[in-house]
């Protein structure tokens, strides 16, 4: 299992727009054959900070995800909403 945790910091006045933009990516990702989990989390103490927890069966499924229309559209639309670049950390899932 290949897991990625993505931190996204959003401009204060763009939080609602971020949620709407990311909703389409979330829904599309859940339908991908290699997807095991795709959670969108909002930090309780910093409401402009979001974490995306993505679990895929393997790296090939992750690569396929990054070529999907919903992912590409989301990445493009996020550019004007973020305060800086996304921060990604990858993991090997041992025990789901």
UniProtKB/Swiss-Prot annotation:
Protein function: Involved in the degradation of phospho-AI-2, thereby terminating induction of the lsr operon and closing the AI-2 signaling cycle. Catalyzes the conversion of (4S)-4-hydroxy-5-phosphonooxypentane-2,3-dione (P-DPD) to 3-hydroxy-5-phosphonooxypentane-2,4-dione (P-HPD).
InterPro entries, A to Z: ABM_dom (IPR007138), AI-2_Isomerase_LsrG (IPR050744), Dimeric_a/b-barrel (IPR011008), LsrG (IPR033672)
Quaternary structure (record): Homodimer.
One example GO MF annotation: (4S)-4-hydroxy-5-phosphonooxypentane-2,3-dione isomerase activity
GO cellular component, one term: cytosol
Entry keywords, A to Z: Cytoplasm, Isomerase
Source organism: Yersinia enterocolitica serotype O:8 / biotype 1B (strain NCTC 13174 / 8081)
EC number: 5.3.1.32
Catalysed reactions, as listed in the record: (2S)-2-hydroxy-3,4-dioxopentyl phosphate = 3-hydroxy-2,4-dioxopentyl phosphate
Compartment(s) where it occurs, according to its Swiss-Prot or TrEMBL record: Cytoplasm
Pfam families in UniProt: ABM
Family statement: Belongs to the LsrG family.
Residues annotated as signal peptide: none
ABM domain boundaries: 2-91
The name this protein goes by in its record: (4S)-4-hydroxy-5-phosphonooxypentane-2,3-dione isomerase
S-S bonds: none
Lineage, top ranks: Bacteria, Pseudomonadati, Pseudomonadota, Gammaproteobacteria, Enterobacterales
Gene name of this polypeptide: lsrG
């Amino acid at each position: 299992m290949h897991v990625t945790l993505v931190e996204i910091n959003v401009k204060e006045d763009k939080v609602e727009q971020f949620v709407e933009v990311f909703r389409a990516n979330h829904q599309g990702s859940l339908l991908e054959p290699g997807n095991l989990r795709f959670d969108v989390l909002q930090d309780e103490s910093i409401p402009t900070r979001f974490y995306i927890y993505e679990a895929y069966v393997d790296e090939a499924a992750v690569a396929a995800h990054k070529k999907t229309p919903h992912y590409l559209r989301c990445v493009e639309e996020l550019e004007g909403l973020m305060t800086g670049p996304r921060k990604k950390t990858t993991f090997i899932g041992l025990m789901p």
